């Protein structure tokens, strides 16, 4: 019953018009009135922000803020995979040979997430990682490794919540929501960075258009909190043992080690 009611309420409120109004408000000067309250409620660290609070003219400007130089360091070990975002570590584990994995009692299909069988098959037997970004986090997304960009594509139209309630009661939001995917070939092994849109402010802006990317390089930004999913080929990485669900991660922090190079 809870799941049914939850989905009904989301469908009633999650329309294009609502998203349009919220997006326009966030981009308007009027939204600057609530910036101080937003910063206080979500406990945003002002010392890390590139600019002073009064220099952000809209909520959108605040959502997409950059950090001061030197506030994040990228792990320099050649074999390391780093967190592409500031966020909360949600889960990690094996991708089954059936190209599926389970989170919070839900089975997710890599075929659905990536749009077709051809893309998905290279990740069978591999590893997934999920990191959640709340409204308080820095919203820019960076590359977790260096390599050549092999494909960029967008899937889905609508987005549903990716918070705890959304993950429990929603319809596989990680593979159904609007999402932007970047695939990277690193020394012959592939990784997919899946940027999952959030409900209402359903926008992911790509900033990187070159054919190569360096570890820690800025790639995109969310205009509100959301989620990233990392997919790795079989036997490509070993996750850091200390990672636990609910753990805060910072951009550039080591989350895994490369275990083989083809």
UniProtKB/Swiss-Prot annotation:
Subcellular localization, as worded in the UniProt entry: Cell membrane
Cofactor notes: Binds 1 pyruvoyl group covalently per subunit.
Cleavage (non-hydrolytic), annotated site positions: 225-226
EC id: 4.1.1.65
GO molecular function: phosphatidylserine decarboxylase activity
Enzymatic reactions: a 1,2-diacyl-sn-glycero-3-phospho-L-serine + H(+) = a 1,2-diacyl-sn-glycero-3-phosphoethanolamine + CO2
GO terms classed as biological process: phosphatidylethanolamine biosynthetic process
Membrane protein topology class: Peripheral membrane protein
Keywords: Cell membrane, Decarboxylase, Lipid biosynthesis, Lipid metabolism, Lyase, Membrane, Phospholipid biosynthesis, Phospholipid metabolism, Pyruvate, Zymogen
First-level EC class: lyase
Chief place where the protein resides: membrane
Residues annotated as the enzyme's active site: 86 (charge relay system), 142 (charge relay system), 226 (charge relay system), 226 (schiff-base intermediate with substrate)
GO cellular component: plasma membrane
General function of this protein: Catalyzes the formation of phosphatidylethanolamine (PtdEtn) from phosphatidylserine (PtdSer).
PANTHER family xref list: PHOSPHATIDYLSERINE DECARBOXYLASE, PHOSPHATIDYLSERINE DECARBOXYLASE PROENZYME, MITOCHONDRIAL
Family: Belongs to the phosphatidylserine decarboxylase family. PSD-B subfamily. Prokaryotic type I sub-subfamily.
Record note on quaternary structure: Heterodimer of a large membrane-associated beta subunit and a small pyruvoyl-containing alpha subunit.
Protein name: Phosphatidylserine decarboxylase proenzyme
Organism this protein belongs to: Bacillus mycoides (strain KBAB4)
